[in-house]
Amino acid sequence: QNMKKILVTGANGQLGNEMRLLAEEHRNFEYFFTDVAELDICDEQAVMEFVSAHQIDVIVNCAAYTAVDKAEDNVELCDKLNHVAPGYLAKAARSRNGCLVQVSTDYVFDGTAHIPYKEEDTPCPNSVYGSTKLAGEQEALKQCPNTMVIRTAWLYSTFGNNFVKTMIRLGQEKETLGVIFDQIGTPTYARDLAQAIFVALEKGIVPGIYHFSNEGVCSWYDFTKAI
């Protein structure tokens, strides 16, 4: 009975919930789904103890400070969650000779290029959110060699650069907001990403940086080829 043990943090977020649903179809792993109530990933000791006690093999970090517009006012909290915490998770994964899947964002780029970004493009964040997520990627890769960073164009690419402004404007008209989200099919999108993560879990984590976006996965082909 030595099933691989998978820890999914941020389990009550959009991606975490999709991971939970898909876990039903992937019974060959044992799962631990946590949110801040079960495990505060900003507490290094708590992370180390949890991972050791439950003998975790792979950590999938779906937890992040994602309120892009509020990040500028909450720099410290944002940095803790997006930069420091992934380092703790990576350290814990390494202590078990395990792997980390760190979910990141295309906000590590400034959004001025209109072509899809490639993995080898040099990051150039122009927001607190983007800077902290980039620092989190670097910290994770530094602390654990078996780290797979998946950058996703969350909802950001769907709306272009004015996502936040659009949301604030639409916030006044709730019905409109509902329609917009329905049209985009946000959950499907999160589900696609969750499915991609399960492909990695099933086939074995290949360390490095990968881009995943709604156009499909630029380097997923290379990733599966590498296995």
Name each region found by the language model.
Residues 80, 84-88, 108-150, 154-155:
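Catalytic helix-loop patch of NAD(P)-dependent Rossmann-fold dehydrogenases
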Residues 4-24:
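N-terminal Rossmann NAD(P)H-binding glycine-rich loop of SDR-like oxidoreductase domains
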Residues 73-101:
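NAD(P)-cofactor binding segment of oxidoreductase domains
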Residues 14, 196, 203-227:
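Mid/C-terminal beta-alpha module of Rossmann-like enzyme folds, strongest
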Residues 9, 34, 59-63, 100-105, ...:
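SDR active-site strand-loop-helix element
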Residues 138-185, 190-192, 198-199, 227:
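NAD(P)-dependent short-chain dehydrogenase/reductase
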Residues 32-45:
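Rossmann-fold cofactor-recognition segment
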